[in-house]
Amino acid sequence: MSPKVQALIFIVGLITLLAAHAQEELSDNIESERGCSGAYKRCSSSQRCCEGRPCVCSAINSNCKCRKTYTELFKEYFEK
């Protein structure tokens, strides 16, 4: 491949990577404005968990906290 084509592919890849990162940051900002709870934070019927995380409560329906999904735990394990 010519150097111009390689440079073009590199630039397109870089732009795609930056756009994906910006989208993640934007979604985090939207969720924080919406008032959702992050991982291991308190939750209730009025205070939902962010990113579709489950709200897990104790047996007497108190001390509810947002738990990470299996996908998040799996991803963190392999990023170490």
Curated annotation (Swiss-Prot):
The presence of a 'disulfide through disulfide knot' structurally defines this protein as a knottin. Belongs to the neurotoxin 02 (plectoxin) family. 05 (U19-lycotoxin) subfamily. Its main location: secreted. Residues 1-22 form the signal peptide. Expressed by the venom gland. One of its GO terms (cellular component) is extracellular region. Disulfide bonds join 36-50, 43-55, 49-66, 57-64. The keyword Signal applies. The keyword Disulfide bond applies. Keywords: Disulfide bond, Knottin, Secreted, Signal, Toxin. CDD domains: Spider_toxin. Residues 23-34 form a propeptide. It is found in: Secreted. Gene3D superfamilies: 4.10.40.10. It comes from the Eukaryota. One of its GO terms (molecular function) is toxin activity. SUPFAM superfamilies: omega toxin-like (SSF57059). This is U19-lycotoxin-Ls1a.
